[in-house]
């Protein structure tokens, strides 16, 4: 079985959903690796984070991911100055870990060639792509040029965005079945009128 060295799984986790957790659980059960590190994004250049602050996202990530096998959660991007470009994050991880494998989804792969300093990314890390049906990745230019850098893995886990969960929070809708129990117990005590711009009373 191929050994993946250090697996890196990043995301806003705003909040972490049950799909995030199931993806990490599936990968940790399926792949052989030395380290598996989950890291919440710090200051992403192309999106403005809303709702949960960095401390809360990090705390929730530790609560839900560190229950899975030997997963570690890193605050590496919160400690970086400036925008959290992937190549900068990989430079930081490379100081401590060898044989990096960055995990991305299919949507991210399809726009991967547009990422900042993509050549640096490919020099610093291999890429593990969670494959989704309906896409012919073998015809993409980035794959044809760098076949040895990519590993595609079937992803049987359903997808659910944090945006979907945040919209439910803003509308006062129950999120019980879309996040883990620990995440739900933590979030249900938040005043989402204040932090998410919620205009509706809770319906749960």
Kindly give the residue locations of the regions a language model identified.
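Nucleotidyltransferase catalytic core that binds NTPs
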Residues: 1-204
């Amino acid at each position: 079985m191929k050994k993946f060295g250090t697996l890196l799984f990043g995301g806003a986790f705003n909040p972490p959903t049950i799909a995030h957790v199931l993806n990490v659980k599936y990968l940790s059960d399926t792949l052989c690796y030395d380290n598996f590190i989950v890291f919440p994004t710090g200051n992403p250049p192309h999106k403005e984070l809303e709702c949960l602050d960095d401390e809360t996202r990090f705390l929730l990530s530790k609560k839900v991911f560190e229950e899975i096998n030997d997963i570690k959660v890193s605050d590496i991007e919160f400690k970086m100055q400036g925008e959290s470009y992937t190549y900068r994050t990989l430079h930081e991880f490379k100081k401590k870990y060898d044989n990096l494998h960055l995990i991305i989804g299919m949507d991210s792969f399809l726009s991967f060639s547009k990422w900042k300093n993509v050549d640096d990314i490919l020099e610093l890390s291999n890429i593990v792509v969670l494959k989704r049906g309906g896409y012919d990745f073998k015809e993409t230019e980035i794959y044809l040029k760098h076949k040895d850098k990519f590993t595609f893995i079937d992803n049987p886990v359903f997808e659910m965005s944090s945006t979907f969960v945040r919209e439910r929070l803003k509308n006062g809708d129950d999120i019980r079945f879309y996040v883990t129990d620990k995440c739900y117990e933590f979030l249900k005590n938040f005043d989402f009128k204040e932090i998410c711009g919620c205009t509706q009373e809770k319906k749960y």
